[in-house]
Amino acid sequence: MPHRIEIDGDTLTLDDIELVATDPSTQVAFAPGTEARMQRSREVVERALAEGATVYGVTTGFGRLAETPIAADRLEELQINLIRSHACGFGPPLSRAGTRAMMLLRANVLAKGFSGIRPLVVQRLLDMLNAGVHPVIPEQGSVGASGDLAPLSHLALVLVGEGEAEVGGEVLPGAEAMRRAGLEPVRLQAKEGLALNNGTQFMAGIGALLLRGAERVVEAAEVAGAMSLEGLMGTPDAFHPAIMRARPHPGQAASAERLRGLLADSEIRESHRHGDPRVQDAYSIRCMPQVHGAARNALAYIRQVLETEANSATDNPLIFPDEGANGLVISGGNFHGQPVAQVLDLLAIALTDLASISERRTERLVNPDLSGDLPAFLTRDPGVCSGFMIAQVTARGGTGTFICPPAGWTSFDRRNSGTALAQAINTIESGAADVVTGAGGAASAGGAVAE
């Protein structure tokens, strides 16, 4: 039986996002009452049009053209032209998982009922997701200041029967992809192009998948760290609960508890419990709970922010059917990607720290000046064989230290570059997983950005 989830704009989790992104058989549907809520929002838009109100992006142009009025008989043309003009991304296509995450998130935030879009348009987006019609979305072209306009426009193109889509591994014109899936393209009405392309779902979708990968990297780092401690004949005494209670950060306590569990009944530890002249281990061994725990704390906060973003209305203007006698249409700035960009900076730092301390443990394992009784570079035949001499150097190059400086502050006009940062973290996370496990990124989500 395929999995099924229901969306309502309020309760989507990161685990739901990963499931839909990585398992194309998962079916997504509206929760009861969701379509009625969207319809009420749409009725506010229709009422504003009937009354001749001036509404940004509905009866006016966009951006610098916001003061330009649009004739009533050209309102639909305005919306389709918006999608066509803004679908100008470049670079390799987003991965299938990233695309599916983005589609799910866009449908979910529209399901909140604050965007003034007809339910049938969002249903068609879900139909595409369920049928495996995946818009081809270039990775590059968004700076996050007004949301992810270019990527979301590429998504919307297929919805209207244009652009390109991947279906079953084959890239097709959007109209043909929809035809093969038995889906009718939609014709956008007033407000609907803007509702589809104004938001943060590109960076938030990638960020959600990267976070799930990072959570696995932490788990792998603790397994690798416990094995390193055994190999170096270290002691888990520094992980004692009393030490953790003296500095009660939740992540630190969780890491220490897991390390104690991994090292419980270790025969290697018992072999040198008595008569060992060493007083304490090196930082990279002794401080694992503090460093890994800081990463755990960071990931918990990032999860909270990304789950909030996954259930947030991020377009402009927003429609509030329950405000005032006839509802309100209000221009705001929920499209700005700074909340996501900021936590993605934190994710980059956390992953880089995990990779860095892991690389230092690798150095201690292979360096004959640091590795105690272990053979130089972990080879039985040093000289003829170099062992893991260069593996440590390679690990050093994979720590991400050269590409993790903050991206959220890189522009004085408040573009946050969160989308570019999400792409960089894909590299950082893959490198961190390689450093921690030596297994070609097996611990990470993998492929959150490019195929």
Placement of each model-derived feature along the sequence:
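Accessory "access/gating" subregions that flank catalytic or transport cores
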Residues: 229-356, 372
